[in-house]
Design a protein with these regions (language model features):
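C-terminal transmembrane helical hairpin of 12-TM major facilitator-type secondary transporters
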Residues: 309-355
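Extracytoplasmic gate region of multi-pass secondary transporters
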Residues: 58-59, 239-289, 293
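Cytoplasmic helix-loop-helix junction between adjacent transmembrane helices
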Residues: 137-171
């Protein structure tokens, strides 16, 4: 096993330890980044950006779609939860049938983007609420072939800059998830155009990745599925803590993304914006989610220099503080609400890639795929709890105080990540 000294030490000054022998790392910061790596990252990230426009395409048009299909409040909330559930099922099935060994990553991403686009567009002809929800579930299953394989492809091109690379990738898909909210500010109640536009972008992403993307030189061969692999992975302290931090992060993230537009709309209405509150709420949701792209990029850049766990602690603590402050700014001047949700959006996802990067470093190289799949699956399963619970809390206490439900997640994640700050871990080499 090759070990890398403290996670907080600059990569250029790290030393590799093999047994009791310390060998200076003579490679420069860029020396282990192969030619073409950054170009490949651009292709993969752009494909992710385009494909992930499907995720919130129905959520962004929930009011208009609910009226069209005469949905109840419970059915409307399932438009988003169905995607989460489909994604969980898809990632678990991918692990059990060993898709990563049977199909190239670029082909998986293409198949997921294309099939997801078809399922999403089919909502236009759904005869009722539950058929539409079923199609959104299938969209989530398809996206399970878009997100984790792309993450593994991107990681296969980088070693010392893996934190930045995955940060840029997560930033791209974050921006993609924000795009439907921007579409609603343009298309208004014409929800059909939002769904069709998202499906068209996803088709383009699938075509892009299958034609131009390829795996990098640091892709370790995967094992056949081992039912005991997860148990062995959880014996590794670094893997356990990285997953624990990720779960705290996911407790907050998707509930915030799903309902921040509703929170902002309610706040603007309380401030007296009247009919323009809904459009302003969609704009706030786009800016809140979209600002996360910059957060991911900055966090990735800093993480490779100051440590992934340390950056995660900062992001988790800040996002928890923002969740608390939502109660204070509710109903105040819109500029304060916009400022807070943008800061919240910037930090709530900034650490996302670092949990994945930590897992790729602590897990054995030939079990990285299983580790990422397990981490992603249980994380997205947890999101369904808070996505469902948040509007219920709002129904009892109002949107002013609903986001306080999300605070325990990042607090718990902060404690898990503090245990990893400055600790040596396995190298991704």
């Amino acid at each position: 096993m090759i070990l890398v000294d403290d996670d907080v030490e600059p990569v250029a000054k790290r030393r590799l330890r093999v047994g009791y022998l310390h060998v200076p790392l003579i490679l420069s910061y860029e020396a282990d980044t192969p030619a073409g790596a950054w170009g490949q990252l651009v292709v993969i990230a752009l494909a992710e950006f385009l494909g992930m426009t499907l995720w919130f395409s129905a959520t962004a048009v929930t009011p208009a779609l609910s009226r069209e299909l005469q949905m109840s409040a419970t059915e409307a909330s399932w438009l988003t939860m169905a995607v989460q559930g489909g994604f969980v099922v898809g990632t678990l099935l991918a692990a059990f049938v060993n898709l990563a060994d049977l199909v190239q990553g670029r082909r998986l991403v293409c198949a997921g983007a294309v099939s997801g686009a078809i399922a999403n567009a089919a909502v236009l002809v759904a005869p009722g609420a539950w058929p539409a929800i079923g199609l959104r579930f299938l969209t989530g299953v398809a996206l399970a072939a878009v997100y984790p394989p792309a993450m593994k492809m991107a990681a296969s091109w980088f070693v010392s800059r893996r934190g930045l690379a995955l940060g840029l990738l997560i930033g791209a898909l974050t921006l993609g998830k924000a795009v439907p909210y921007l579409m609603t500010t343009v298309f208004g109640d014409r929800w059909q155009l939002t769904l069709l536009a998202a499906s068209g972008l996803s088709l383009l992403g699938g075509l892009l990745v299958v034609l131009l993307a390829r795996d990098g030189p640091f892709l370790a061969p995967s094992r056949a599925f081992d039912p005991h692999a997860i148990r062995r992975l959880l014996r590794i302290r670094g893997v356990r803590l990285a997953i624990a931090g990720y779960l705290g992060h996911m407790w907050e993230l998707y509930a915030m993304w799903t309902w921040v537009g509703v929170f902002a709309t309610a706040s603007f209405a309380a401030a007296g914006l009247g009919p323009s509150a809904a459009i302003a709420g969609s704009a706030a949701a786009f800016l809140a989610i979209g600002s996360g792209a910059a957060g991911c990029a900055l966090a990735g850049y800093v993480a490779d220099r100051m440590g992934k766990a340390r950056v995660a602690v900062w992001a988790l603590a800040t996002s928890a503080s923002c969740a608390v402050l939502t109660a204070a700014v509710f109903g105040t001047r819109p500029v304060w609400v916009f400022a807070l949700v943008m800061l919240w959006g910037f930090t709530v996802v900034a650490d996302s890639a670092q949990f994945s990067a930590l897992v790729t470093e602590y897990a054995p190289p030939d079990q990285v795929g299983t580790a990422l799949t397990f981490q992603t699956s249980i994380g997205f399963l947890l999101t369904m709890v808070t996505i469902d619970a948040l509007p219920r809390v709002a129904g009892s206490f109002g949107w002013q105080y609903a986001s306080l439900l999300l605070v325990p997640g990042p607090v718990a994640g902060t404690l898990a990540m503090r245990a990893l700050v400055g600790k040596p871990g396995p190298s991704p080499l």
